[in-house]
Design a protein with these regions (language model features):
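Ferredoxin-type iron-sulfur electron-transfer modules and their immediate structural context
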Residues: 1-44
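C-terminal structural segment of proteins
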Residues: 40-196
Length: 196
């Protein structure tokens, strides 16, 4: 019989000063939940969007290099190499969100997800990161849409055009064409959220 784990609220926690006991309890819980170093997970687009670094027993590499179509993970990590740490840089003034479209529960893999990170200054987007999950074998960064958003206010028109650019050239399979519309909606939602 398992005992439910209390829901954590990271917005109320000081994540810099977690106690050793809490870290060990969380590690045990996470070991029973799944693996975050797989490309289909919810966390991989977030790690790419936030410029995380993956530390292993032998090296450190950007998340974008670990989750890539160019190389297989078996080519990235040696058989005796383990992921030991994930560093996410703290960037002042960055608004980051993760939106996930799924049919059932939060434990489902995303049918489409979007990790977004924006830096705003005076109501203008200074920088943007848009990384999709669930639409490709690895997290899919949309740099053309990021460039388009830079220097613009988060308006309806800007959101529409960013969504169009983000999905430009998308070639869905016959039975998952809906993902294009869902992905466009997630981009629009992420941009318009900045107006609040």
């Amino acid at each position: 019989m398992s005992i439910p784990v209390e829901e954590r609220n990271l917005e109320r926690e000081d994540t810099v000063t977690i106690s050793q006991e809490a870290a060990e309890a969380e590690a045990r819980r996470c070991m029973n939940c799944g693996c975050y170093s797989v490309n289909a997970s919810d966390i991989s687009p977030v790690l790419v969007a936030l410029d995380a670094e993956i530390k292993t027993t032998k090296k450190t590499l950007p998340a974008a290099e670990l989750f890539t179509e160019k190389l297989k993970v078996k080519d990235m990590l040696d058989p005796d190499e383990l992921v030991t740490e994930i560093d996410i840089p703290v960037r002042e003034g960055v608004s980051a969100h993760y939106d996930k479209f799924r049919l059932r529960d939060s434990v489902d893999f995303a049918m489409v997800s979007l990790a977004s990170a924006y830096e705003l200054e005076g109501g203008i987007i200074k920088s943007a990161r848009l990384v999709f999950g669930g639409v490709a074998p690895v997290p899919l960064r949309r740099e053309a849409a990021e460039s388009y958003l830079t220097g613009k206010a988060p308006t309806e028109e800007t959101a529409e055009e960013a969504a169009r650019i983000a999905l430009e050239g998308a070639v869905p399979f016959e039975k998952n064409a809906y993902k294009v519309q869902v992905a466009m909606s997630l981009v629009k939602q992420s941009v318009l959220r900045l107006k609040a």
